[in-house]
């Protein structure tokens, strides 16, 4: 082996002569066929596996390599590390030896034991020419070594700029940047950008960014920003921020780059990096001052006092989007919270912007103007929406470094970087705070949050269809430049960009297919995607976009045809592509996504964005239509009064669908519809009637509009109307209505409840309610135009089971003055709060309406288990003052004290009659004119009715015919009743089981009592009264339930007689019931606790509360009949609470009440026979009474079980 070692030593020492001699001996030995001389092994390898060719390649001697190759040395011989001579030649970076080896057919992609090919070594050590030659000889730059690094990775890791440029210019650049040969799940996975950032190679990073590498690509350690921050590479951090890296991305250890700097570094460089990251992060940290949660809002952020919240963005409705990171649990929570519950704990250093509100009042969405930055203000009005990435332009001011901790330096907004999604890996959106105190218009295609524009009621804006507003529609300045709206996109865009010296980007916008309206909705990500990569330019263009004022251009209706929709968007050229792809209807187009657009062939970014904006508008309109249908939105629209569009609450995180203001409380919760209506209407503006809906659409669910609404007072709701009905009681839309009407907020849909307040109608206009009466809950009818013929306010009950004719009726007044008053009826009422009564009662006047609250919802009748009974007060307390002799009423009864909730409690105010035209068949829930002149009234309430919420109640009432043309002689007030019916019996505690029925029958049946004695106010009746109840119609009540009539009459008089007020005092007033009828002005209805009232000359009856037991009053539906209604005499009132121990006495009173009801029916029969109607009405009345007795007996049985 001596000669082989000599050869290796000679090659190693570069002794060409010695090598030549040894090689020559090898040649001579080959020529000799026989000889004792042993042949020289040219491929001999030492202990390390090195051969002579290895040493020659490593030394770079061309002569030695050539000699060895001539001597048949193996060109791809491997050493102990698997390295070949080409590896060493490439490592040395000498071009000619590499060329020589390559000509000798060296393997260019042969890998060593650690997986490296010669190109790895050439790239790692920056040998540009060698790398270029290897690439020319088909070396594969995508091969990875055992550390999962490509030649580009090594070049970037070691800062080999020229080699990196060479590799980036190769045809496999995209594969290198994407890392196709790498597994992202590998723990050693890395990218060239990470390696360059870790080692601080700024120029290499610039080349990588220029080549289009994903700046936010993440590895186990995070993004490249994490690496640069951890290793203290300040300039690299600044460069990455300029490139638009997302500073809020967390690594697998749930750390941001700023967290890493705070935890692991303390150098001067780290302090600078902290400064840069704080400026770039867009972070405003606040601390919660108190607990806040909203279980009904899935988008709400539930916080506890002391929680530190990172503010991400500002929602247009005034709420802030925050993020809470719980380090102990390793969880993150993102949601919206009102800014009034937090205080600022850290402020970003940067450009001073608007201060945070110090008062606990959230930002309201009623700002109808977009903030316009000053000419020298470097802070752009970045729109909310997709959370832009942060970048800092080198030529843009970085803010005042001395303003750390100052109140105004809340931070600066950075422009966005690449067009990739800024969604964090933890599933929560990250981004920056929109720090202006005013909501900014959405420029993101992802935002479906209309309603930024909130006109005040005085704006008198015309009504627009649902979801007709788009964010930021009305701005403070006119369109700039003017031709933006004229479709000359190229010239308009060029002129616009020329205003801030960036006209060089005109081609970028045009090539991407953007026109001016779509530019107005661009985000910083969109700007990056079209090639605006310079952060300073991107920031400037974004700020100018935010100042654009472009009128609404998206169609605010759902077109029938796809082509029509595309033409409205200005993209009819895609009709064929959409149809051929199967999107041939509007329903299918509404579900388009970005990915599907690319598959279809819509490749221009501007066209994609415009189509997606149109798709979002379709979704908004569809949601708006569904919302309108759910609330009974009809087609009829009124033109009176101001129009408001209400935004829907963020129920599931989606933006609602209707535009307009949302009036908020100090914690950002929505005000009730009534307060919105009152605040929007200024307290005096009459609101128009909303369109009606059918009873099948009326349900409790229509009232359940999200959180916090269960105790709200509803907005007035008119009854179902059909303008085409021949005998409607509605004025045409264009005619003036005789009284002011109520309306819910436009766009919100009609509220499912009606509250019309009967009242006195003097010749002078009715004054408004005093401050004690809540305006939002009480609407007054207007005074009549002609004093002699005051119109009556329209009212109707809420029928739960409505006949067909009622479907076609319209709400409103009859044409011309209507004189006959409506008969009162029984209805569900609820007890108002004591505070409401105390506020209302002392200042009530005869012309004041009553505060109203919601009753039960309309619903189709259905059978079911009884709902839970309402809570009741044990009794009624209150007093009434007798009405004055001139017909005006005193203060209302029952308004000064608590009262029990009532079901059937009519009020007895009267109105002076006026001429009225006969009407056709009306709904059984509407009161027809009657000669007694008793207007309708509704009970009202201040608390929830559980059984009303269940929607199981059913009122069965018969249609009542209209009376004859009224006479000019009015009558004193009389009482008539329509009692509601329930298909279930509400149970009460045993000691009070019979009290509800007894008090209900007191209201109904005492009108006919003929018990003798001076204490009976009914003993003096009109001469035309029919015979006594001895000749009553067939009665099917069980004797076991109803005691004898005499006993019941006497007990009834003892219970119902008011002590100290003898009955005959009511005689003079009652004697006029059918004789001369003096003019009596209308008495206003009682306050929410509507009590029965007997007007008389010398009586002061006590209030009676009618309990919540439903009575059946059901009978055949009648055709309209002529003739005056009988005048039921007034009844005395109960003096005080009813003791629970008088159960037997209540049963007796029940009997007398039934007897009185029969007498009232007989009086009605007598009156009708005398006035000329046929006997059919008599038969129907008796049938009604009989049917009512049947249901009443069943209920009595059930109650006594």
From Swiss-Prot:
User: Which positions bear Phosphothreonine?
Assistant: 880
Q: Which positions does the entry assign to ANK repeats?
A: 48-77, 81-110, 114-143, 147-176, 188-217, 220-249
Composition-biased stretches (Polar residues) = 415-425, 837-856, 1012-1038
Compositional bias (Basic and acidic residues) spans? Answer: 730-739, 1160-1172
Write out the GO cellular component annotations.
Answer: cytoplasm
Stretches of Low complexity bias are at: 904-921, 935-944, 1042-1069
Annotated positions of the Phosphotyrosine modification: 253
Residue ranges of the region described as Disordered: 355-466, 675-1103, 1115-1179
Where on the chain is Phosphoserine found, per UniProt?
Answer: 358, 371, 393, 396, 403, 406, 409, 471, 724, 855, 874-875
Q: Protein name, please?
A: Caskin-2
Annotated localization: Cytoplasm
Q: What is its main location?
A: cytoplasm
- InterPro entries attached to this UniProt entry: ANKS1/Caskin, Ankyrin_rpt, Ankyrin_rpt-contain_sf, Caskin1-CID, Caskin1/2_SAM_1, Caskin1/2_SAM_2, Caskin2_SH3, Caskin_C
Name all SAM domain ranges: 488-551, 557-621
**Keywords for the protein's UniProt record, in alphabetical order:** ANK repeat, Cytoplasm, Phosphoprotein, Repeat, SH3 domain
Do the record's keywords include Phosphoprotein? yes
Which residue intervals define the domain SH3 in the entry? 281-347
Q: How does it assemble?
A: May not bind CASK.
């Amino acid at each position: 082996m001596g000669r082989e070692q000599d050869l290796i030593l000679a090659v190693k020492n570069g002794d060409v002569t010695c090598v030549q001699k040894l090689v020559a001996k090898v040649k001579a030995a080959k020529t000799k066929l026989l000889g004792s001389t042993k042949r020289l092994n040219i491929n001999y390898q030492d202990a390390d596996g090195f051969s002579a060719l290895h040493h020659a390649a490593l030394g770079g001697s061309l002569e030695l390599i050539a000699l060895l190759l001539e001597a048949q040395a193996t060109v791809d011989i491997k050493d102990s590390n698997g390295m070949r001579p080409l590896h060493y030649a490439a490592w040395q970076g000498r071009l000619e030896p590499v060329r020589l080896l390559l000509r000798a057919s060296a393997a260019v992609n042969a890998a060593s034991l650690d997986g490296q090919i010669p190109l790895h070594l050439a790239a790692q050590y920056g040998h540009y020419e060698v790398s270029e030659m290897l690439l020319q000889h088909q070396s594969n730059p995508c091969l990875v070594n055992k550390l999962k690094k490509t030649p580009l990775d090594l070049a970037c890791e070691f800062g080999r700029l020229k080699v990196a440029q060479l590799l980036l210019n190769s045809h496999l650049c995209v594969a290198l940047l994407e890392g196709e040969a790498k597994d992202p799940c590998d723990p050693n996975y890395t990218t060239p950008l990470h390696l360059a950032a870790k080692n601080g190679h700024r120029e290499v990073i610039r080349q990588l960014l220029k080549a289009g590498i994903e700046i936010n690509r993440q590895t186990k350690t995070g993004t490249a920003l994490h690496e640069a921050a951890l290793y203290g590479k300040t300039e690299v951090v600044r460069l990455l921020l300029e490139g638009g890296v997302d500073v809020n991305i967390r690594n697998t250890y749930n750390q941001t780059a700023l967290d890493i700097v705070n935890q692991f570094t303390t150098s001067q460089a780290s302090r600078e990096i902290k400064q840069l990251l704080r400026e770039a992060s867009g972070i405003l940290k606040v601390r919660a001052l108190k607990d806040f949660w909203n279980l009904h809002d899935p988008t709400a952020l539930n916080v506890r006092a002391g929680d530190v919240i990172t503010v991400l963005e500002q929602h247009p409705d005034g709420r802030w989007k925050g993020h809470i990171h719980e380090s102990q649990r390793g969880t993150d929570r993102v949601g919206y919270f009102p800014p009034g519950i937090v205080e600022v704990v850290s402020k970003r250093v940067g450009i001073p912007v608007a201060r945070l509100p110090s008062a606990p009042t959230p930002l309201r969405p009623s700002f109808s103007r977009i903030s316009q930055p000053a000419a020298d203000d470097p802070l752009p009005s970045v729109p909310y929406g997709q959370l832009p990435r942060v970048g800092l332009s080198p030529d843009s001011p970085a803010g005042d470094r001395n303003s750390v901790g100052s109140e105004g330096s809340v931070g600066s907004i950075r422009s966005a970087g690449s067009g990739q999604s800024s969604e964090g890996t933890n599933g929560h959106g990250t981004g920056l705070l929109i720090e202006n105190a005013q909501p900014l218009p959405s420029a993101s295609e992802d935002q479906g949050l209309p309603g930024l524009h909130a006109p005040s009621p005085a704006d008198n804006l015309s009504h627009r269809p649902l979801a007709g507003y788009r964010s930021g529609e009305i701005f403070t300045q006119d369109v700039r430049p003017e031709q933006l709206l004229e479709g000359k996109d190229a010239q308009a865009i060029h002129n616009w960009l020329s205003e801030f010296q960036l006209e060089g980007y005109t081609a970028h916008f045009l090539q991407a297919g953007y026109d001016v309206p779509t530019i107005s909705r661009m985000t910083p990500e969109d700007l990056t995607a079209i090639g605006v990569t310079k952060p300073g330019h991107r920031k400037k263009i974004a700020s100018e976009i935010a100042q654009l004022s472009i009128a609404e251009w998206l169609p605010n209706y759902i077109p029938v045809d796809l082509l029509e929709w595309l033409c409205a968007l200005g993209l009819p050229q895609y009709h064929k592509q959409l149809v051929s792809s199967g999107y041939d209807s509007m329903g299918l187009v509404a579900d388009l996504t970005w990915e599907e657009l690319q598959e279809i062939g819509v490749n221009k970014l501007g066209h994609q964005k415009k189509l997606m904006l149109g798709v979002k508008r379709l979704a908004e309109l569809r949601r708006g239509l569904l919302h309108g249908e759910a609330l009974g939105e009809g087609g009829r629209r009124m033109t009176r009064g101001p129009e408001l569009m209400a935004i829907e609450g963020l129920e599931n995180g989606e933006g609602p669908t209707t535009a307009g203001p949302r009036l908020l409380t100090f914690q950002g919760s929505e005000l009730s519809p009534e307060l919105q209506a009152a605040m929007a209407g200024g307290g005096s503006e009459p609101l128009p009637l909303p369109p009606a809906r059918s009873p099948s659409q009326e349900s409790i669910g229509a009232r359940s509009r999200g959180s916090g609404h269960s105790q709200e007072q509803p907005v007035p709701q008119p009854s179902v109307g059909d303008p085409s009905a021949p005998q409607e009681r509605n004025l045409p839309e264009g005619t003036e209505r005789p009284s002011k009407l109520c309306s819910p907020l436009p766009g919100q849909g009609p509220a499912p409840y009606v509250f019309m307040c009967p009242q006195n109608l003097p010749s002078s206009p009715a004054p408004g309610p005093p401050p004690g009466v809540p305006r939002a809950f009480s609407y007054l009818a207007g005074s009549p135009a002609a004093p002699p013929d005051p119109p009556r306010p329209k009212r109707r009950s809420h029928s739960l089971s409505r006949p067909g004719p009622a479907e076609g009726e319209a709400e409103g007044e009859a044409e011309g003055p209507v004189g006959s008053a409506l008969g009162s009826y029984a209805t569900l009422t609820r007890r108002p709060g004591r505070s409401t009564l105390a506020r209302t009662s002392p200042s009530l006047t005869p012309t004041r309406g009553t505060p109203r609250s919601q009753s039960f919802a309309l619903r189709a009748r259905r059978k079911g288990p009884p709902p839970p009974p309402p809570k009741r007060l044990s009794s009624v307390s209150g007093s009434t003052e007798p009405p004055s002799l001139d017909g005006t009423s005193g203060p209302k009864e029952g308004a000064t004290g608590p009262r029990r909730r009532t079901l059937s409690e009519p009020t007895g105010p009267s109105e002076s009659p006026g001429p009225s035209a006969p009407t056709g068949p009306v709904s059984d829930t509407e009161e027809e004119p009657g000669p007694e002149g008793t207007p309708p009234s509704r009970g009202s309430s201040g608390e929830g009715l559980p059984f009303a919420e269940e929607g199981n109640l059913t009122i069965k009432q018969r249609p009542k015919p209209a009376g004859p043309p009224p006479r000019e002689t009015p009558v004193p007030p009389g009482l008539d009743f329509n009692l509601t019916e329930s298909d279930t019996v509400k149970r009460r505690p045993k000691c009070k089981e019979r009290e509800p029925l007894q008090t209900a029958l007191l209201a109904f049946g005492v009108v006919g009592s003929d018990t003798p004695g001076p204490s009976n106010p009914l003993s003096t009746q009109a001469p035309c009264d029919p015979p006594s109840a001895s000749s009553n119609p067939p009665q099917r009540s069980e004797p076991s339930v109803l005691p004898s009539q005499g006993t019941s009459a006497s007990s009834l008089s003892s219970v119902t007689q008011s002590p100290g007020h003898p009955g005959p005092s009511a005689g003079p007033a009652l004697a006029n019931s059918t004789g001369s009828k003096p003019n009596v002005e209308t008495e206003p209805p009682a306050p929410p606790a509507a009590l029965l009232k007997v007007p008389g000359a010398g009586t002061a009856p006590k209030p009676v509360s009618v309990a919540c037991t439903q009575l059946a009053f059901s009978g055949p539906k009648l055709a309209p009949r002529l003739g005056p209604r009988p005048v039921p005499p007034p009844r005395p009132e109960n003096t005080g609470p009813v003791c629970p121990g008088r159960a037997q006495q209540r049963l007796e009173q029940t009997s007398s009440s039934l007897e009185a009801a029969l007498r009232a029916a007989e009086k009605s029969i007598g009156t009708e026979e005398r006035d000329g109607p046929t006997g059919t009405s008599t038969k129907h009345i008796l049938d009604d009474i009989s049917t009512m007795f049947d249901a009443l007996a069943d209920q009595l049985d059930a109650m006594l079980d």
